[in-house]
Design a protein with these regions (language model features):
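Juxtamembrane helix-capping/reentrant segments at transmembrane boundaries
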Residues: 32-36, 90, 94-115, 162-176
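Core segments of transmembrane alpha-helices
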Residues: 43-54, 111-120, 173-192, 207
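Alpha-helical transmembrane segments and their membrane-interface exit regions
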Residues: 81-87, 139-148, 207-216
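Transmembrane helix-loop junctions and nearby membrane-interface residues
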Residues: 54-61, 120-127, 146-149, 153, ...
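Multi-pass membrane catalytic core of lipid/isoprenoid biosynthesis enzymes
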Residues: 38-45, 49, 96, 100-150
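Membrane-helix interface and helix-disruption motif detector
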Residues: 64-68, 127-130, 194-199
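C-terminal membrane-associated helical module and adjoining short loops/tails
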Residues: 1-36, 152-245
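Membrane-embedded alpha-helical segments that form the functional core of polytopic membrane enzymes
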Residues: 35-103, 135-136, 200-203
């Protein structure tokens, strides 16, 4: 597998052009892997808070008039802000406290999908005109983008935030700060601000096509089988030919 270490000016990571990837502070350390950290606790709290607020929004019921910004939708917007703010906070805490773990990254990715699905299902329930754009977006975010996001597990990096050592283009277009904003925030903001289902459909379809292109690029890079897989006790069960049983 070929690793890339480049600095094209768009990245602010602690490495220099031509650096040896092995020297970069991006690799997971099994001695520091654990389930509960300050960051994962924040992940659990912000996820629970978001889902509870969405539940209250749905309990408020569908508005009886044509009011767009109904009390229920306002609660959904609050849930969305809690999700985004919490997602930013847990990442910052993990990095600043040096508690980044692959477990935490995976929990964060899964929690993002849970919060996002809850918000968008609530939005489509309140405003059925958004159903098609929402379905397109969730197909992109919960299936294709989810697969892209967990692809880092095939390497020993700590999270997708360090995917630039595998492929700088995939990283820059998916997990740089501008890319995260476009993928996570643009669609929701446009729907809520413009109230235009057709525009949401165009954006969602565009994101879907783009993520499929990223999936094709990832397939060309290839997903290696991580070393260290096998029986939980580390013993090597093999066949007569020496292959894993």
């Amino acid at each position: 597998m070929r690793f890339i270490a480049v600095d094209d000016g768009s990245l602010t990571k602690p490495f220099v052009k031509g650096a040896d990837p092995a020297s970069l502070d991006v690799w997971a350390d099994e001695t520091t892997e654990r389930f509960l950290t300050p960051a994962t606790i924040i992940t659990f709290i912000r996820t629970i808070a978001c889902i509870v607020i969405v539940a209250f929004a749905i309990r408020s019921g569908v508005p009886h008039d044509d009011e767009f910004w109904s009390p229920a939708l306002k609660l959904l917007a609050v849930a969305l802000v809690v999700y985004w703010a919490g997602d930013s906070l847990d990442g910052q805490v993990a990095r600043r406290m040096h508690h980044e773990t692959r477990t935490g990254a995976l929990l964060d990715i899964m929690s993002d999908r849970f919060c996002s699905a809850a918000f968008y299902f609530g939005l489509a329930w309140l405003h059925p005109e958004f159903t098609i754009p929402v379905v397109l977006y969730l197909a992109e975010f919960m299936v294709i983008d989810f697969f892209l996001s967990i692809a880092f597990l095939a390497w020993r990096i700590r999270s997708p935030n360090y995917f630039y050592v595998v492929d700088a283009t995939i990283y820059r277009l998916n997990w740089s700060h501008p890319a995260k904003a476009v993928n996570s925030a643009l669609f929701a903001v446009l729907l809520l601000v413009t109230q235009a289902p057709w525009l949401g459909g165009i954006i969602a379809a565009g994101l879907l096509v783009f993520k499929i292109a990223m999936l094709v690029r990832l397939a060309k890079v290839g997903l290696p089988v991580p070393t260290g897989t096998g029986l939980a006790d580390g013993s090597a069960a093999t066949t007569e030919q020496g292959a894993p049983a």
